[in-house]
Regions:
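A contiguous pocket-lining binding segment that forms or flanks enzyme active sites
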Residues: 283-319
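Short, catalytically relevant binding-site loops at active-site mouths
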Residues: 75, 212-213, 239, 264-267, ...
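DG-centered beta-turn motif at the end of beta-strands
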Residues: 70-73, 255-266, 271
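A short alpha/beta connector and helix-capping loop motif
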Residues: 83, 92-95, 269-290
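Phosphate-handling active-site elements
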Residues: 250-261, 281-283
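Thiamine diphosphate
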Residues: 1-154, 159-245, 249-255, 303, ...
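Short, function-defining helix-loop hinge/capping sites that tune catalysis or transport
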Residues: 65, 271-273, 298
Length: 320
């Protein structure tokens, strides 16, 4: 396995000084270390496409190569700027992508990751993105990383490090840097239990990716409730509000639809709030549980505690 600290220092020795992306469970040890030590040159982005955009801006300002990290499920968000801006036929922007390989063939994973893992390398090939696989062999992987950086530099093009499961050893990072986060994480499950008790029994529930959907499933089990009214958005992070809005628009108007969302999900595709807020009818209800972090993939902080969601919601057309 790769030691996150030593690997980080090795990458720094190759003149990679800026890091941005969206946290991933397979990369959580590396991302956790970066988050602990890089207070100035590290940005947790709203989504993977935004991370690529930030990396482009960094390169334009410095001519250096940024590292962009993400889970492979986030490649969809990154495709547009990678193809329409970074590609050698457009602006030819070099960057090093670090992509966690969820759903890697032959390795057990959650159902929503299996197809993504199976088609990922084919996707990269179709996009003409040269990839290099990181398996957790420190001698081989250091050389592989240098090859990837050399490729990005010489070809002025993105190169992809595909990181296998368990490539990084565990790192005990400071994943809760704020007492508010610690409190919010502990209280989320209790809040969900109260929400499920209070909403109408026949209401439809659309829940966001990560811990919220997992805990709703577990709470329903504990209450001996059925799951037929719930749509657990296990993939497609950031799209729960849009799904709930679409459902509320065409379901019987007498039936309520509750979107139970998280801060990381809302931030990822915040523009969707303008649609659900302005066009949503009285049967659409949007509940945000803000714990200030990406809890299910390592606990790295979001900027959510610095957002005035009440004012934002009013501006987006929501009624209180």
């Amino acid at each position: 396995m790769l030691d996150p600290e030593k690997y980080f220092n090795y990458i720094k020795s190759l003149d990679v000084e800026f890091f941005t992306g969206v946290p991933d469970s397979l990369l959580k040890s590396f991302c956790g270390y970066v988050n602990d030590v890089e207070t100035k040159n590290h940005v947790i982005a709203s989504n993977e496409g935004s991370a690529v955009g930030i990396g482009i801006g960094y390169h334009l300002a410095t001519k250096k190569i940024p590292l962009i990290y993400m889970q492979n499920s986030g490649l969809g968000n990154a495709i547009n700027p990678l193809i329409s801006l970074c590609d050698k036929e457009i602006y030819s922007i070099p960057m090093l992508l670090m992509v966690g390989w969820r759903g890697e063939p032959g390795k057990k994973d959650e159902p929503q990751h299996v197809k993504q893992g199976r088609v990922m390398l084919s996707m990269l090939e179709a996009m003409d993105l040269n990839y290099f696989i990181i398996k957790g062999d420190k001698n081989e992987d250091y050389e592989t990383t240098k090859k990837a950086l050399d490729y990005a530099s010489k070809n002025s093009s993105p190169a992809v490090l595909v990181v296998c499961k368990d490539a990084f050893s565990k790192y005990s990072y400071n994943k809760v840097q704020n007492n508010n986060i610690r409190f919010a994480a502990k209280s989320r499950e209790a809040a969900l239990a109260q929400i499920l008790k209070k909403i109408p029994k026949d209401a439809a529930v659309v829940s966001t990716t990560g811990m919220i959907s997992r805990e709703i499933f577990e709470t329903r089990e504990a209450f001996n409730d059925g799951h037929e009214r719930d749509f657990l958005t296990v993939g497609g992070m950031g799209h729960a509000a849009s799904i709930a809005y679409g459902l509320s628009k065409y379901i019987k108007k007498s039936k309520m639809v509750f979107c139970i969302d998280g801060d990381g999900s809302v931030i990822m595709h915040m523009g969707a709030l303008s649609t659900s807020g302005i066009l949503g009818k009285s049967n659409f209800k949007h509940i945000l549980i803000n714990n200030g972090c990406h809890d299910s993939v390592g606990g790295q902080e979001t900027v959510a505690f610095n957002i005035d969601f009440e004012s934002l919601s009013v501006a987006m057309g929501y009624n209180f």
